[in-house]
Amino acid sequence: MYLTSVRPETLDELADLNINLVSFANNHTTDYGPQGCLDTIEAAEARGIIPCGVGRNLMEARKARFLDTAQGRVAVVACSSTWAERALASNANADVSARPGLCPLRWGRSYVLPDEQFEQLRKIDAMLGTDKSLKEVSKIETWDPPTDNAFKFGSPMNGNLQIERGKRAYVRDYVNEADQEAILESIRDAARRSDVVIATLHTHEGENENWYATYAPRFVEEFARKTIEAGATCFVGQGAHFPRGVEVYKGCPIFYNLGSLLMEFEAGESMISPEMYETYHLSSDAYPSDLHSNRAKKPDGTWNGFYSERFSTNYLVALDIEEEKATYSIVPIDLDMRRENNLERGLPVISDPEERRKFAEYLTEASERYGTVFAYREDAGSILFNG
């Protein structure tokens, strides 16, 4: 369990940086329930920050949010797929009040197995007795019963896997069509009323259930392309704490994940619940610095977790529109999670030229599936790309 928050005045720093539009739709939106989400919305609005992807009800969470500038109007349609069912907003009806929360893009997965492995798992299900449990629970709860080609493996009520028969083994992911269409309709509306439409999705998910895979899962790729078809100027993925590749679709960029702007774990003033301390084997009266310093290094002093791999280099995207034509350039940033001074770890600085060159090569490799090529321009100090 990972529950965390910061004090409302932390948002003053975003306001001081003139960050105007912020998506608050993510897997922590309702860590402290619907009231926590409502408190966040009100704290942002009090500071002139426009909260995107969240609302006092589902209709508000799904709506585009706008910023008018001297150069034109920008719209943001924001949503989240990661654990979205835990935090989705709800509209009122005759019986219940509206519930604050996020704009969800819910999704599901099935584990597809060839005949031999499918039958093996079905036999194991019978040996465990969970097949009989599922049949009885399904009858009482009026669920669809198992079929010859699909069944749920595990506990009927406390977690199970959807198993399907197929020609090969793979993870089949699929999107909630109603959620997707509602988001696309918001994008169509925004495109009619703005000069630039940014569709953004908070998504940790990767291929084959791996949050740290190079590529996004199929449902994210398909959704991103549909946002462009609906009128988005670009699609921005965020959530995974490292950069994923870029696809150019119908002339518009899909940034599958920018990475992180900040990862100020050790020096940050996070507020952490007792349950989260327990998850990391600490007492409930521990300090945030206890938790985060333990996550930074192993007992033998070697770097661990976010400090041990590819999480330092991330990037910003500069969007420039001239004569109704949009151009994009990538500006790599270095969070340097291994700085000697732990107070500086996770704070962004512009990457040096050599790191920018290396990052252009990394993005080209991470975008191989899409055929996008990146090149570092020393005169501009940024990375350009074509698809």
Pin down the residues of each PLM region:
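Acidic, metal/ion-coordinating pockets
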Residues: 1-387
